[in-house]
Amino acid sequence: MEDCFLISAAVYSPSEKDAIAESDPTEPLSPYGATKLLSEQLINKVGVAENFTSISLRYFNVVGSANIDFGDNSRDNLVPKVFAAIKAGKRPEIYGDDYPTKDGTCIRDYIHVQDLAEAHLVALKQLEKGKVDEIYNVGSGTGYSVKEMMEQMSKSMGVDLNPVTVPRRAGDSPKLIASIKKIEKDLGWRPKATLKEMIDSAWAAEKGAK
């Protein structure tokens, strides 16, 4: 028996490194990250006990849409949260601008949902070839700050977002950027979408939402 599981980059400890590798420490700050790490540990235990083969994909921040009819309804994520604020006539919020980053806002690695889906398919094909128990990061390998994201969103949407800074949220790491060297080497996977393409597709789906 084999399967591919989606975990999350939220399992990682806060890091000053330019890119986080799969072997880096996992001490999540948030309850969400803790539950994802527990899931991964349980998968590993089942694999040992039941001869269960798996690949876990630690995905970073998913953005965009592969179909105009399917947008992101998770209002906890940055991009749809900004969309919701603008549509409601409110100013989008930046949670803290005093982090040890280039502009004081959190830095994250964003990946298009279509690229994530393709990584999943590549992982499943690898499982079909034989016994594999691996963990892979799935991201773009590039980090963007909240302010940089909002600048691109402003361009894609054609509006001035005029964000307001509010206090930090508990559990937010200053920086999370994926090292994707392992998945590139082992599976031959690389992301294709640019940040502009991610946000353009997300905005198109948001406008097309019924």
Where are these regions (language model features)?
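C-terminal substrate-binding subdomain of Rossmann-fold SDR/epimerase-dehydratase oxidoreductases
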Residues: 86-210
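C-terminal catalytic core of Y-nucleophile DNA break-rejoin enzymes
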Residues: 78-79, 112
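Conserved catalytic-site loops of classical short-chain dehydrogenases/reductases
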Residues: 1-5, 53-55, 135
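Short amphipathic alpha-helices and their capping/turn segments at secondary-structure boundaries
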Residues: 46, 80-88
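Catalytic helix-loop patch of NAD(P)-dependent Rossmann-fold dehydrogenases
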Residues: 11-61, 67-77
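Hydrophobic pocket-lining residues within nucleotide cofactor-binding pockets
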Residues: 62-63, 99
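Conserved NAD(P)H cofactor-binding loop of Rossmann-fold oxidoreductase domains
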Residues: 7-9
